[in-house]
Amino acid sequence: MDNINGLPDDLLVKILSFVPTYVAVSTCVLSKRWEFLWMWLPNLEFVSPWDSRPGIVDFINKKLPIHRAPVIERLCIHINSNPHIKPEYIKRWIEIAVSHYVRELQIDYHSKTKITLQLEAESYFIDGKYLQQLISGCPVLEDLSLRFCCNDNLREFTVIIPSLQSLSLFLFGNSNLNRYKIDTPSLKYLKLEDWNDPEHYSWTNMPKLREAYVDVESSNHLKTLIGSITSVKHLTICCLEDYLYGDGFIFNHLEHLKLCMCPFDSSNLLGQLLKGSPNLQVLDIFEMKRNDIVCWNQPSSVLECLLSSLKILNWSAYFGRPQDRDIAVYILKNACHLKTATFLTDKRINDVRRLKMIKELRLSPRASSTCQLVFGEDF
């Protein structure tokens, strides 16, 4: 013990940084000198086995405000179903973390109202009440993730962040959220899962967007969003309502499109997206799992992307229904530069039907003499 006590404080703090936070804290009983050494740690994790202890909330409330490290590199707090926690505690923890120039912040809290918080300098996850305050304290924020769950008291929120490059929004059903505004001119990546139908939403200023994942319930939301994501190179899209989003939207940079065709048939949406994507190279169709018979409205003329750019077609959960076959045959017949077309049949289809579907596709005409058909089973 005398040997280690002879080391400078900076080196002792460095040593403590290699052990879990709860172990580092336990060294405070060794001597007067060790009482506050752990409070210089730049990384703090109040997680298992601490998260289940009754006094963890009081400990954080008492010690975090007097933490001595000028910069907190990482603060991680996981608290599950603790009756002693209050929203104002979380607010205070956020304020303290921001005041210490936190680089990475995670707060996971599950309460009876299903409010979950997780914040990081690259991926922020927070209840909306304190969102604006947090954003104002992070002027160079690049990655933001928001999750608003059922029974939220949140009514509206605004995200205006000039520096933001990645945004993930998870807006789950039965939320009281009815309006939000997004203004992110530097955004490169967007992930949106919105299962609500807010009264008003505004998406503006995303000229640098390169990749987007869009899963929305309302076609109205899709219509509002579509004009702001036309700069993407990679687009994944799923909409519960098969309605067209309007004319005049061209995805000149779109190279890779993934379209979810369930739970409602989205053949009309597929046709419009193909029509507006003249440089598309890869088309993925997936999760088409309903048996509704909906006609494929074949375009009156051959789409530009089929004539000039489409090289790869991947179709997962292929059912071989009439409209499925019509879409597949249309693409094979007109895609002049198609290299591979992969069809993974749904595992629930029996062997006789599967062989029939494969035969239909093998016998269909192909515009590309070098196109290879690949068949398999979707697991």
Curated annotation (Swiss-Prot):
Database matches in Pfam families: F-box, FBD
Species assigned in the record: Arabidopsis thaliana (Mouse-ear cress)
F-box domain: residues covered: 1-47
InterPro entries assigned: F-box-like_dom_sf (IPR036047), F-box_AtFBL13-like (IPR053781), F-box_dom (IPR001810), FBD (IPR006566), FBL13/AtMIF1-like (IPR050232), LRR_dom_sf (IPR032675)
FBD domain ranges (all copies): 295-345
SMART domains given in the database record: FBD (SM00579)
Gene3D superfamilies: Ribonuclease Inhibitor
Protein name: Putative FBD-associated F-box protein At5g38570
Regions that span the bilayer: none
Lineage summary: Eukaryota, Viridiplantae, Streptophyta, Embryophyta, Tracheophyta
Source superkingdom: Eukaryota
CDD domains in alphabetical order: F-box_AtFBL13-like
